[in-house]
Amino acid sequence: MHTFLLAFLAAALYGTGLVTTHFGLRYLPALAGARVSIPSAALLFWGLSPIFMDWAHWQGEAVMLFALVGSFYPAAVTLLTFVGNRRLGPTVAGTIGSTTPLFAVLGAALFLGEVPGIRESVATAVIVVGTMALSKPAGCPVPGTERSALWMPWSAALLRALAQVLSKAALALWTSPFAAAMIGYSISTVIVWTAGFLTERSVPSFNRRGVAWFALTGVLNGAAVLAMFYALTSGPVTIVAPVVATYPLFTLSLSALLIRHERMTARIVGGVILTVAGVIMLVAR
């Protein structure tokens, strides 16, 4: 149950972070926002490191794996998601992103020996279908001129799954979720700022409201990653990945309360029912 609670906490934080991102994008473009959110989490981790960081049992191979994960998660995944959203729309990108648990479960089976049982496999499939229903409104075809961009959300989904599998392997070597998050976000900070310098011809204009919203987003996402890493230390990827993927439930609920543009349709109700049913199947013993 400890693993489920941590995974649910990660899902809730991820879902909330998507809502705060919505507000932040009113004041800053996506890449500028990423250059605020990711470093904000990194700075928070470094600030707390004297309290929570224990270098006594550090393991070099684990540090290298943490850094490898940080080279693409969250930095590259964030950039792929932002560009994919811009070219394909959040609906298509979000729907493809919902397939992450399938790749994570497959990767865990191939590389970690975590072969899921029939119940876990069915529950994962039900959760994926449910989150797809929550992410994909009816009638949203991909423009023909933008179909070449479909590789972006697919790549983001694969990289998210790979991050979970590699992090699980690294945490088996050094059981320090805090180190995993701090090292990963530090590497991602360098990458996202480098990407900004290479792609932007002028210095980005930051304003206080945008910075505040994206700093909050960074803290929420960083806490979500930390909770997910703690869940991975106590449970298998085949359980953690599908539960973390339920974050659209929290995004939908908060959007209905704060943004108030989401209508309850049969599709959404069905998606909620499927997602909750899949989680119950995972929790049931």
Where are these regions (language model features)?
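Juxtamembrane helix-start motifs in multi-pass secondary transporters
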Residues: A30-A34, A93, A180-A181, V240, ...
